[in-house]
Amino acid sequence: GSNRERSQIIMRLSAEGLKDRAKWEEAGYALPKFDREKVTEATKENPFWIHFGAGNIFRAFQANVVQNLLNDGILDRGLIVAEGFDYEIVEKMNHPHDDYTILVTLKADGNIEKTVVGSVVESLTVNTENASDFARLKEIFAKDSLQMVTFTITEKGYSLVNGKGELLPDVEADFVSGPEAPKSYIGKVAALLYARYQAGEKPVAMVSMDNCSHNGDKLYAAINTFAEKWEENKLTDAGFRAYVNCKEKVTFPW
């Protein structure tokens, strides 16, 4: 009925909808305790952490951890998230809700904890056909402030071959077309890392957070393969592969 519709309008998950904090708190939601506009501005200007993979693991863990650190005043900047498989997560979930999400946690005692998570302040598609998103990703990767690039893209996200050990068609095409407009996921990540190399060989930690053995090695092997092929095919500066392999500059911890 009209009452229910009215309450849904009032409880809209967006920057505008969250202005009525009392309404949300009465309904049992914990809200961000930090100045989100200020955090958004600082993060976009000087991003320090970008995460690839905008799924549930990211929303429940990385985003929630950063929210707690922002709430406690330990951090002054939030997260940027990029999605490379399912662009609709960004276009139909993140953007309409101003990058806010709701985390519902079932506690051991049976209580349900509801939290509005506001630590993600920008979301982008990892899509070379979306020129503005990919240009923005390159801009983020060129920033001095960037320290950490993290991933939850599933184990298969790092694979360059199919079940038979044959190169995936997109990967094969990317090896010969170079870093301008790659189609494969790791090709796009390698192209972004190349943008960081071109901006002055700036240091960065490339951190796989997927639950697989030696996850950092898998990420390194995939990116290094691109660096090798692109150098072989004279599609990048000669120093890019050395940059990927220089542990003072780029690390792949596991």
Where is each model-derived feature located?
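Short, Lys/Arg-enriched N-terminal segments with co-localized hydrophobic residues
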Residues: 1-10
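Non-transmembrane, aqueous-exposed alpha-helical and coiled segments at domain scale
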Residues: 9-254
